[in-house]
Amino acid sequence: MPGMRDIKRRIRSIKSTQQITKAMKMVAAAKLRKAQEKVIQARPYAKRIQGVLSRLVAAASDVNHPLLTTREVKRVGYVVITADRGLCGGYNANIIRKVNNEIKGRDDVSLVCVGRKSRDFFKRMGKRIEADYVGLGEDISFGMAKEIAAKVMELYEQGTVDQVQLVFTEFYSALTQKPVQMQLLPIPAQAGESANSAKDSKGPQPLYAFEPSPEAVLDELLPKYVENQIYRALLESKASEQGARMTAMGSATDNAKEMINKLTLSFNRARQAAITKEISEVVGGAAALG
């Protein structure tokens, strides 16, 4: 059995760690509230732009736009969104595992890594990384999404990749986050609300007049769709990260409390044994003198 001095040292160490994990849980909870508000605000706009896009694409079906045109897939690009830091449970590992299972052993893959964890992992794996974005911070701006979207569209339009998959973590609650994958480019013909469902809906369907031209309208709208999808993915991922961190730090704090209780019990037993031993020695000494 460890000595009382060793047990006291372990208790002090665990209490110190417990204070850190408790503080991290509280910070993550505060950040989660802000991130969750942004996600809730962004979702309706993302859904709306998908619906508008599907109707416009259906109305301008004779227009060939580079971001809509499907071509033979020789190289696939993955936009992988993780965190810069750890201590957030399985948040990073789940995304990395999902992508790694798809691209393991393949040479026809290019990556755009958002977050230090994905960049470092796939760099060690020797994968081709076209661009990486780290240190985005807690306050995700639309400008960050535009920068990433511009790079992704450049890779696609130049033919570096023939298809782009967006992989991120969708936020449901502080306890539930799910890794998801969606095709970003070419933009699916039925992105979000499908053109068919629009046609099947009751009531007369709107007739669109494109000014100055269908090409000009789509040139403006399609990049905004890509930017918005990446922006929403960044917000969903940030909220998921904070939710996972809050949960992980809460579990760590509870585990520390349990360990402290067990060690305290061990310490009390060791102290009781030491006292009993001292009493026995005193009694034994007195008996010997008598």
Swiss-Prot record:
It is found in: Cell membrane. One of its GO terms (biological process) is proton motive force-driven plasma membrane ATP synthesis. InterPro entries: ATP_synth_F1_ATPase_gsu, ATP_synth_F1_gsu, ATP_synth_F1_gsu_CS. One of its GO terms (cellular component) is plasma membrane. It comes from the Bacteria. GO terms for molecular function: ATP binding; proton-transporting ATP synthase activity, rotational mechanism. It is a peripheral membrane protein. Its main location: membrane. Keywords: ATP synthesis, Cell membrane, CF(1), Hydrogen ion transport, Ion transport, Membrane, Transport. The keyword Membrane applies. The keyword Membrane applies. Pfam families: ATP-synt. Belongs to the ATPase gamma chain family. F-type ATPases have 2 components, CF(1) - the catalytic core - and CF(0) - the membrane proton channel. CF(1) has five subunits: alpha(3), beta(3), gamma(1), delta(1), epsilon(1). CF(0) has three main subunits: a, b and c. Produces ATP from ADP in the presence of a proton gradient across the membrane. The gamma chain is believed to be important in regulating ATPase activity and the flow of protons through the CF(0) complex. This is ATP synthase gamma chain. It comes from Heliobacterium modesticaldum (strain ATCC 51547 / Ice1). The lineage of its organism: Bacteria, Bacillati, Bacillota, Clostridia, Eubacteriales.
